[in-house]
Swiss-Prot record:
Record's keyword annotation contains Ubl conjugation: no
Origin species: Pseudomonas entomophila (strain L48)
PROSITE patterns per UniProt: RIBOSOMAL_S8 (PS00053)
Molecular-function GO terms, alphabetical: rRNA binding; structural constituent of ribosome
Protein name per the record: Small ribosomal subunit protein uS8
Highest taxon listed in the record's lineage: Bacteria
Function: One of the primary rRNA binding proteins, it binds directly to 16S rRNA central domain where it helps coordinate assembly of the platform of the 30S subunit.
The family this protein is said to belong to: Belongs to the universal ribosomal protein uS8 family.
Length: 130
């Protein structure tokens, strides 16, 4: 059976691994997943990530905890295959008053909502993280 939404699968694997208090979660790799992992690392939501394997690359994400609780409290998919959400730069959502981040796919790459506003570009709102 083919996977319809690989990014939603990635987010679900991260949520499930954090509920089970795992230190590392592994999944099939793709360019989009690596870009989202890079944004999560840059924003301090995960400890690190690594791509391994040549023929079938695998993405391993090292999860981050603070005082025994996961750093990521909420991880939600916004745009999905059945209902894409494209937003102009002025319409980009602020997550919990700016405490969280939206991850946006723009023509200049995958970035946070803050970086997209600074660059003056809109795009597809992939997910929100808090």
């Amino acid at each position: 059976m083919s996977m319809q939404d690989p990014l939603a699968d990635m987010l679900t694997r991260i949520r499930n691994a954090q509920m089970a208090e795992k230190s590392v979660v592994s999944m099939p790799s793709s360019t989009l997943k690596v870009a989202v992992a890079k944004v999560l690392k840059d924003e301090g939501y995960i400890a690190g990530y690594e791509v391994t394997g040549e023929a079938k690359p695998s993405l391993s994400i090292e999860l981050k905890y603070f005082e025994g609780r996961p750093v990521i409290e909420e991880l939600k998919r916004s745009s999905r295959p059945g209902l894409r959400q494209y937003k102009a730069v002025s319409e980009l959502p602020k997550v919990r008053g700016g405490l969280g981040v939206s991850i946006v796919s723009t023509n200049k790459g995958v970035m946070t909502d803050r970086a997209a506003r600074a660059a003056g570009v809109g795009g597809e709102v992939l997910c929100t993280v808090f």
